[in-house]
Each structure stands twice: as structure tokens, then as C-alpha cells.
Regions:
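A short, glycine/Asx- and small/polar-enriched loop/turn
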Residues: 130-136
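Cytosolic beta-strand hydrophobic patch enriched in CBS
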Residues: 1, 40-41, 59-73
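Residue-level detector of anion-binding/catalytic polar loops
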Residues: 38, 59, 119, 157-158
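Short amphipathic alpha-helices in soluble, non-transmembrane regions
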Residues: 109-113, 145-157
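Conserved short beta-strand edge segments in small beta-sheet-based binding/regulatory domains
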Residues: 121-124, 153-164
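Tandem CBS (Bateman) regulatory domains
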Residues: 1-37, 45, 50-54, 74-110, ...
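Helix N-cap motif at beta-to-alpha junctions
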Residues: 102, 138-146
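A structural signal for short, well-ordered beta-strand elements
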Residues: 39-42, 141
Length: 164
């Protein structure tokens, strides 16, 4: 999109519609394309591809194998993966808990949910402001909101909990 905008005439142009049409008919893909294209290998991790896309503000990346184009990964692909990772299409209890980043703390948390009959559909950890802690986003089914809240409070500080 940016390449096409750069190649298009300015809106402030004095050219009439016919002159614009003529000029655009002479415009080729070669004149508008990005030549120094960032790519990823087919065996690269999805999170690394997402990081490259985010850092470079790219909407997509060509995927290569042995110097051959084998596909493309797009921001829409990453959104679909994000939805899948968070089990966004499944109803349940979703909680964000800040807990100690000590060995076994996540295991204790997930075991308590399981012992209460909960089925963990998704569990994602992210950095907290304090490096001694992690933010854990968990989504579980087959568990009551109040039961899940009690477990979350036993294991850390609840930032958010809700039925979704």
C-alpha cells in the first residue's frame, strides 16, 4: 500500500482525469515494488516472524525455503493464531494473575485449577513490570468464576477475572 501511495500522483496535482489515467497506465509493478524485501525462512518460529513484522511495521513477510518463495505470512495469519492461542472462540473463565516467577509457581497454579475440575484451554505468560513476577493469562472451562478467583488469589495478584 505504501509503495502504491508513493507512486500515485499527489492529490494536489493539476492533471485532469485523462492525464492521470494515462500516467497510471504507464506505471509498472517494478516501479512501485519494494526491492529490499525482508523474508523469513519456512522453519522460523511464528513469534520471530511476528517480531520482525512488528519491528519493521510490515503487514506480511515472504516465506522462503532454499531461496524459493514457498508462501507468505500476514498479519491476518497472526491474528488467527492469536485467537487460537487465547481460545477466543471458547467460553470459559479468563483471568490475568501476576505471580512470582519462581520455579514451580505456574505448575502449582495449573494443578489447583485442575484439582477443582477446571480444564485449561489456554495459558500464556508475559513480562510483568517487576522482573521477579510474570503475568499469567489463563482461560479455563468447567470451573466456576468464584472458584477460579479463589485459586488465582491464592497464587498471586488478580489483575482481571471474568466469564467470557
Amino acid at each position: 500500500e505504501n509503495d502504491l501511495q508513493k507512486a500515485a500522483p499527489s492529490q494536489a496535482t493539476t492533471l485532469d482525469m485523462y492525464e492521470l489515467t494515462y500516467l497510471l497506465s504507464k506505471l509498472t509493478v517494478e516501479k512501485t515494488m519494494t526491492k529490499d524485501v525482508k523474508t523469513v525462512s519456512f522453519d522460523e518460529t511464528v513469534e520471530e516472524a511476528a517480531r520482525i513484522m512488528s519491528d519493521g511495521d510490515f503487514g506480511c513477510l515472504p516465506v522462503m525455503k532454499d531461496n524459493l518463495l514457498v508462501g507468505i505470512i500476514t498479519d491476518s495469519d497472526l491474528f488467527r493464531m492469536f485467537i487460537e492461542m487465547f481460545s477466543a472462540r471458547t467460553s470459559g473463565v479468563r483471568a490475568i494473575v501476576q505471580m512470582s516467577d519462581e520455579p514451580g509457581s505456574l505448575s502449582v497454579f495449573t494443578q489447583k485449577i485442575a484439582m477443582a475440575g477446571g480444564i485449561i484451554m489456554s495459558c500464556i505468560t508475559t513480562e510483568a513490570e517487576n522482573p521477579a513476577f510474570r503475568k499469567v493469562t489463563v482461560k479455563a472451562t468447567n470451573i466456576a468464576l468464584n472458584t477460579c478467583k479463589e485459586i488465582c488469589e491464592q497464587c498471586g495478584t488478580v489483575e482481571d477475572i471474568r466469564e467470557v
